[in-house]
Every structure is written in structure tokens, then in C-alpha cells.
Amino acid sequence: MCAIVLAAGEGRRLRPLTAYRPKALCPVGNVPLLDRALHRVAALGFADPDTVAVNACYLGEQVVRHVGGRARLSVEPDDPLGTSGGVARLRDWIDGRGVLVGNADAYLATPDAPPGPDIAALLAGWDGRTVRLLGRPVTGPSRPGDFGRHRFAGFSLLPWSRVRGLPVTPTELVRTVWRPAEAAGELEVVEFTGTYLDTGTPADYLAANLHAAGAGSLLDPTATVTGRHRRAVVGAGAVVHGTVERAVVWPGGVVHPGEHLVDAVRVGADLTVPATPAA
């Protein structure tokens, strides 16, 4: 088996944050999302360029530089190929293996197990023929993208038989693999009962950061914080002289004296991205 972490997307809903970094490199709890994904699959045994790959496109040079030699890199030269096309472009590297596919922007956490073991049920007892999805139970009304009473939670497991014929064109796994497998009775949903956020909007991105921080604040030891903070995440080299509450200050960010940053993300000295949860 092998693993692919999908990190090519632009993250348009997360703009203007993603004007500075690709979504995969946006920090959650002061750790880039991509590093969280790589750590999770490494704990399952996918920890070198022979067993784990990362794709890149939007601001791809940042992803390439960040990954270095930790994984096989697949740089898509034009527009992102989507989740299916991105996997297809790595077909020669996959070379007959089953593949665990994870979204870099998926934030998962459970109090019952560390990253890696928390999704190990996705691999347990797999026969190499079915398609498996990690799914959160749906407690409210169903959505068109749901799978029965479950909602996709960032990771899927694909057999080689479903990968080898994928076209290297912009398209999504939900259309090329998941729904066809569901129609054929070859889709299994493995339940995940922990926290899952796709970090696709500023509000969800803030929620993931606050979850990572727990009940208090998470302050990088290199940050300078003289102001008040409550449920805040403050990155490396940041300077906080004002008040931060339910907020994220990116590495190198500045909160000036007298400022009150609340339900927002601060980038640099003057960019404030509101992240108020939807009513």
C-alpha cells in the first residue's frame, strides 16, 4: 500500500489567507495542515518517498520547499487536476498498490487515539477490492454529498482496480470512484466519531485552531505576548500587545497596543480576516 496527501488546491473560500500560502500550509494550532496529514499517515507506516506522495499546484513552490525529501512530489504544471486527476497523475508511482488518499486540509482529532491510530480502522481487514471512506455520522438533515447517514471525513482507501483507469484530467474522486463504487455495492463507510473540520472557510479554519488549542491559548515560545489573550493561537515570532480573543495570529503577525482582535485571523501587521461562525 501507499498514501497520497492532496495539497494542490487553491482554497478560494479561505481567501484572502490563501493569497499568502496554499491552504495546505495554513497553520492550525501552529502546525501546517500538511504536516498534520503527513504525521497521520506516517504513524500508519507511510513515511518516505516510496510510500507517501504529495501533489502540489497552487503556490506549488511553497509546498515543494516545505515537503523537501519527506515524500514523493507531483507538481501539476497548470491548473489543479482535482482529487481524481491528482491521484491519476501518480499512477506509475502507485504501480499496482492500494492507496490511502487524504486531504491536506482535513482537520481530525479524537480523544481516544493519536493521529494515525485514530483512522486505522480504515485499513483494518481491508480485502484490497472495495472502496472505503472515512465518514462522520450525520446528526442533522442529509446533504446531497452524503453517503447514507455519513459525511466524508477527509480520507478514502482505493483499490488499484479503481485507480489504474483514472484519466489525468481535472475531475473529482466522488464522480470517478466513490459514487460508481457505491452504485456497484463496493463502497464501505468506516465511521469516525471524532472531530472533523475541512477548514475550507475562515470560520471553520478558526474553529479548527480553537479546537487544537483546547480550553486555553496556544502561544508559540518565540512569540512576544504582553497583551491579554483568551482562547487564542499565536504563531512563531508574532507580537501581541493588544487583546486577542477567539483569534489566530499567524507567524510574524502583529496585534498593536489598544487593538482587540476577536473571532478573526491576523496576518502580518494589518490584514484582519473575520472568522465569525455562521448563525
Where are these regions (language model features)?
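A generic "binding-loop/recognition-motif" signal
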Residues: E10, R21, L59, P77, ...
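Conserved catalytic-core motifs of eukaryotic protein kinase domains, centered on the activation segment
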Residues: P16-A19
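Active-site regions of enzymes building and remodeling cell-envelope glycoconjugates
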Residues: G69-S74, S142-R149, A247
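Conserved beta-strand segments of alpha/beta enzyme cores
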Residues: A24, R70-R72, E186-E188
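Conserved N-terminal catalytic core of the sugar/cofactor nucleotidyltransferase
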Residues: M1-V5, R13, P27-D112, G268-A279
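Active-site metal-binding loops of divalent metal-dependent hydrolases
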Residues: E10, A104-A106, P137, G253
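Catalytic-core segments of class I nucleotidyltransferases/pyrophosphorylases
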Residues: G98-L100, Y107-R132, P137-A213
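Structural signal for interior beta-strand "rungs" in well-ordered beta-sheet cores
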Residues: L218-A279
